[in-house]
């Protein structure tokens, strides 16, 4: 496959968005893989890799406690897409890769991976913030109930109202 124009910028942006280790695995020759890896700035690369080698690499990374995202577009990527914590297929890729992947990126542009990571980060931030609020608010309601400041019906009403408000805000 030819090198995508946006590959280097996408790798840099993914690293800036919090991806700590970026690995390229390809069936291409060592010489070709090394040249591409240097140009795009990945942390590690593996050449002349078979489909089962990709899946085995992912299993080893997961066994080491890492969360693994696999991006692929071909039939040969299917076992690895399935093995990863999150498999991402490129829309112009093989149909089986799109079926196996957890997410299919609609545009044939690696920058979409950066957008996906930014959306993911924003959603997780919102979930954590909402969780902290609900726990703190409910602990306050329990404390007020135990202290006799709030009646049980008032506490239940406030609890349900806060849950509804957080749900609507989300």
Which residue stretches match the model-derived regions?
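Membrane-embedded alpha-helical bundles of multi-pass transporters
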Residues: 18-19, 40, 76-77, 82-86, ...
């Amino acid at each position: 496959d030819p090198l995508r124009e946006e590959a280097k910028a996408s790798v840099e942006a993914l690293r800036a968005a919090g991806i700590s280790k970026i690995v390229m695995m390809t069936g291409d020759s060592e010489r070709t893989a090394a040249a591409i890896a240097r140009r795009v700035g990945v942390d590690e690369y593996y050449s002349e890799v078979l489909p089962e080698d990709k899946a085995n690499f992912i299993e080893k990374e997961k066994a080491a406690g890492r969360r693994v995202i696999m991006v692929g577009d071909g039939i040969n990527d299917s076992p690895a897409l399935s093995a990863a914590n999150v498999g991402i297929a490129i829309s112009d890729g093989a149909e089986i890769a799109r079926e196996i992947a957890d997410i299919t990126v609609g545009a044939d542009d690696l920058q979409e991976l950066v957008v996906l990571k930014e959306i993911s980060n924003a959603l997780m931030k919102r979930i954590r913030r909402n969780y902290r609020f609900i726990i703190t608010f409910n602990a306050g309601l329990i404390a007020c109930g135990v202290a006799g400041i709030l009646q049980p019906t008032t506490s239940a009403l406030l609890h349900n109202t806060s849950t509804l408000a957080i749900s609507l805000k989300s």
